[in-house]
Amino acid sequence: MESGFKVTLKDAIRTIPDYPKPGVQFRDVTTLMGNAQAFRRAVDELVYPYAGNRIDKVAGIEARGFILGGAIAHQLSAGFVPIRKKGKLPRDTARIAYSLEYGVDEMEMHRDAIEKGERVVLVDDLIATGGTAEAAAKLLLQMGAEIVAACFIIDLPDLGGRKKLEALGLPVRTLVAFEGD
């Protein structure tokens, strides 16, 4: 990468203690995204393994996955597919329900966003328990996508999300791990 790079990706991520509740260390990736050098490096590192390969679409999970996914799609000359919370898309959608800590939520995508057999990279800023990413991956698979990889800037490995995606047979790429979260 750039020889003058001074800040590590991990250093570019702000930690906010006790947010949103006591005992939680919130990893705020928006500080990395606001640092041009760090953001470029993160995007470049996530793109690198797939550059030169056929990637048809990048699917980003609402909301920070849109920011990251758009940049990655641009670099890969691929289309971008938003995966959104229920009720946010205007046309015919495919939907999947998934469990949260205290209930159930749903996410959706346009039915015509993916053609069967298209090669897709799934993107979000962070993987923790993996529930949202797992649901997004299952939705893409239901739509006929071939998921090339799931990519995240941050991994909270103690919460097991990576293992959920790997259990689906998906390669997972992360750039920074915060152990003990």
From Swiss-Prot:
Spans traversing the lipid bilayer: none
Broad class of the protein's primary localization: cytoplasm
Family: Belongs to the purine/pyrimidine phosphoribosyltransferase family.
Name recorded for this polypeptide: Adenine phosphoribosyltransferase
Pfam families given in the database record: Pribosyltran
Functional summary from the UniProt entry: Catalyzes a salvage reaction resulting in the formation of AMP, that is energically less costly than de novo synthesis.
SUPFAM superfamilies per the UniProt record, alphabetical: PRTase-like
Gene3D superfamilies: 3.40.50.2020
GO biological process: adenine salvage; AMP salvage; purine ribonucleoside salvage
HAMAP family the record matches: Aden_phosphoribosyltr (MF_00004)
A molecular function (GO) term: adenine phosphoribosyltransferase activity
CDD domains (alphabetical): PRTases_typeI
Keyword flag Transferase: yes
Localization terms from the record: Cytoplasm
Key words of the record: Cytoplasm, Glycosyltransferase, Purine salvage, Transferase
The EC number(s) this enzyme carries: 2.4.2.7
Source organism superkingdom: Bacteria
Gene Ontology CC: one annotated term: cytoplasm
